[in-house]
Amino acid sequence: MTELGLGGVYLSPKQIGDPEALVHRAFDLGINFFDTAPLYAGGESQRIIGEALADKPCILATKCGRWSWEKGPYRDLEAYKKQLETSLDILKRDCVDVFFIHEADWAVYWEDMDIPRSRCEVELWDVFDYASSPVTQFLNWAQEQGMIKHIGISGNNSHLLTKVINEYPLRIDALLVAFQYSLIWRNAKETLIPTAKKKDIGVILGSPLQQGKLAVPHPEWLEEPPDWMNADTQQRFRALYEIHRETGISLAELSVRYLLANPDFTSLVVGSTNVAHLEENVQHALAGPLPEEIHNKIDELGKVFPGLWGKDF
């Protein structure tokens, strides 16, 4: 698996003029890991990746779940089977290399009850019978059928993903975590990454730019911060912008080079909306680690947010 992967969230003709060309270019640049999901781009992401990579040797990851906020198909074994069979057909594959539970930190996978949106997340004190849940039965079946190679979980909450990893009965091979480790937010370093390392789980990092919040400087935020930014976070952004100003290195390059220097990560999944951005990300990766002084300054910016969500935005 290459240290840089292409995320499929934005892969649709509505957001990218020629999304298949973008995927082809990623492959030509040496990227061999592609992450998608039935949810992404209303299903277009899987179709585009399937068309672009039909005859290419690469590592494909997709996901199950994420139908709605109610229990519905989450408690239906046949719904999972149908979803996987549809994904394989669209991806033009007989087998998925890495198959994630999409947002495994949602209780709706593990509880046989209707769960309102305010209660969608697992709680640290919850007790679940993971083994009897339909998704676990489905994953067992899918592996036995040779339809998936590696089981993974994904999510956005470090504390709750740690709980699932510690309690889940099946072998977890991969963890895809988003929003929990970046230039500023480092919630995953507290318990999640150490737990994954202890259990020999490969850690794949998603949304390294916090869905655009760390993509480019926003000097106006230093004058009038957005609602999600508290005073402490504002000061960290101020310090980050100063590093950017002093070094002349873009925030995107700082992010890619800083994160790839961490040996705990198997791959960094980045989304691109055009070929130029994709090529820039690859060049950033090829540039190698940041100079030690710059790396250490960014290290000092790291923030572990104490709340269960692990973030303040």
Feature names for model-found ranges:
Residues M1-K14, A61-K71, F100-E103, A107-V108, ...:
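N-terminal small/glycine-rich loop or linker at the start of catalytic domains
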Residues M1-T62:
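N-terminal binding-site loop/beta-alpha segment at the start of enzyme catalytic domains
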Residues S12-G17, A37-R47, W67-E70, W106-A107, ...:
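Acidic-and-aromatic substrate-binding clefts and catalytic sites of carbohydrate-active enzymes
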Residues K14-A26, R75-I90, N157-I165:
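Short, acidic/polar
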Residues D28, G50-I59, D89-K92, I165-P169, ...:
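Acidic (Asp/Glu)-rich catalytic clusters
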Residues K56-W69, V177-Y181:
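A short, structured active-site edge motif that brings together acidic residues
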Residues C64, Y74-I101, W106:
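Active-site gating/metal-coordination segments in enzymes
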Residues A104-D312:
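Beta/alpha (TIM)-barrel catalytic core signal, keyed to glycine-rich beta->alpha loops juxtaposed to Asp/Glu
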